[in-house]
């Protein structure tokens, strides 16, 4: 199957609470420029023609979801999220019915994604898959439990992982299964694929594809979105 004929599915884990935001609701439902973060994110994916379906994994009895008109788009399928991000992604993968599908896993709170970056990911064809990432630009320190510097890392080989992360759906499903069986802490999909023996490609992304994690990130995301 060529890259032009393979089904492309997006999985968006959106069941988290975002405790570091110190907000009165999960961060994906915070509002920027009249829309929630989740709406901004979904609209980018919906408007990208190669994506055939978006699987949205949300918390059970989510009280905010039905307030969003965008979730009624026919491309969007809702599934129940898991206990953590990896569990939500796993549930999303289980809902994929298309054979030979490739999956783009994207954070609900990364609203500034561009189609140009998605185009670059779609160039990947081998089973290693790949992720958007940016080279580390700040000096990186390794710390002790007491928050004292142990050493300075060589940043020339360090990259900061972003999303989407793009893999064959069946391979990612098996990689997550294997990671769960071994009790691996899966912080992103690439870590599960690495554990399974793959070497995902690093695709240079953009610094404005930020994940809204802390209160100060909201203003920065608003600035980037206002310039689109």
From Swiss-Prot:
<keyword id="KW-0548">Nucleotidyltransferase</keyword>
<dbReference type="InterPro" id="IPR001228">
    <property type="entry name" value="IspD"/>
</dbReference>
<comment type="pathway">
    <text>Isoprenoid biosynthesis; isopentenyl diphosphate biosynthesis via DXP pathway; isopentenyl diphosphate from 1-deoxy-D-xylulose 5-phosphate: step 2/6.</text>
</comment>
<dbReference type="GO" id="GO:0019288">
    <property type="term" value="P:isopentenyl diphosphate biosynthetic process, methylerythritol 4-phosphate pathway"/>
</dbReference>
<comment type="function">
    <text>Catalyzes the formation of 4-diphosphocytidyl-2-C-methyl-D-erythritol from CTP and 2-C-methyl-D-erythritol 4-phosphate (MEP).</text>
</comment>
<dbReference type="InterPro" id="IPR050088">
    <property type="entry name" value="IspD/TarI_cytidylyltransf_bact"/>
</dbReference>
<keyword id="KW-0808">Transferase</keyword>
<feature type="site" description="Positions MEP for the nucleophilic attack">
    <location>
        <position position="211"/>
    </location>
</feature>
<dbReference type="InterPro" id="IPR029044">
    <property type="entry name" value="Nucleotide-diphossugar_trans"/>
</dbReference>
<keyword id="KW-0414">Isoprene biosynthesis</keyword>
<feature type="site" description="Positions MEP for the nucleophilic attack">
    <location>
        <position position="155"/>
    </location>
</feature>
<dbReference type="GO" id="GO:0050518">
    <property type="term" value="F:2-C-methyl-D-erythritol 4-phosphate cytidylyltransferase activity"/>
</dbReference>
<protein>
    <recommendedName>
        <fullName>2-C-methyl-D-erythritol 4-phosphate cytidylyltransferase</fullName>
        <ecNumber>2.7.7.60</ecNumber>
    </recommendedName>
</protein>
<comment type="similarity">
    <text>Belongs to the IspD/TarI cytidylyltransferase family. IspD subfamily.</text>
</comment>
<dbReference type="InterPro" id="IPR018294">
    <property type="entry name" value="ISPD_synthase_CS"/>
</dbReference>
<dbReference type="InterPro" id="IPR034683">
    <property type="entry name" value="IspD/TarI"/>
</dbReference>
<dbReference type="Pfam" id="PF01128">
    <property type="entry name" value="IspD"/>
</dbReference>
<feature type="site" description="Transition state stabilizer">
    <location>
        <position position="27"/>
    </location>
</feature>
<feature type="site" description="Transition state stabilizer">
    <location>
        <position position="20"/>
    </location>
</feature>
């Amino acid at each position: 199957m060529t890259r032009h004929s393979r089904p492309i599915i997006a999985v968006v884990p959106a069941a988290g609470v975002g405790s570091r935001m110190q907000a009165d609701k999960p961060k994906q439902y915070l509002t920027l420029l009249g829309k929630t973060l989740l709406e901004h994110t979904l609209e980018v994916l919906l408007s990208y023609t190669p994506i055939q379906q978006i699987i949205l994994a949300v918390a059970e009895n989510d009280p905010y979801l039905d307030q969003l008109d965008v979730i009624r788009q026919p491309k969007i399928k809702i599934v129940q999220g898991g206990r953590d991000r990896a569990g939500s992604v796993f549930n999303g993968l289980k809902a994929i019915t298309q054979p030979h599908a490739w999956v783009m896993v994207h954070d609900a709170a990364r609203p500034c994604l561009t189609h140009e970056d998605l185009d670059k990911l779609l160039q990947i064809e081998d089973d290693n898959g790949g992720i958007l990432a940016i080279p580390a630009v700040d000096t990186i320190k390794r710390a002790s439990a007491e928050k004292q510097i142990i050493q300075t890392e060589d940043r020339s080989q360090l990259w900061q992982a972003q999303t989407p992360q793009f893999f064959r759906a069946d391979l990612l499903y098996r990689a997550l299964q294997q990671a769960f069986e071994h009790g691996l802490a899966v912080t992103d999909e690439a870590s599960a694929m690495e554990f399974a023996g793959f070497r995902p490609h690093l695709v240079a992304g953009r610094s404005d594809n930020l994940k809204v994690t802390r209160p100060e990130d909201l203003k920065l995301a608003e600035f980037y979105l206002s310039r689109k």
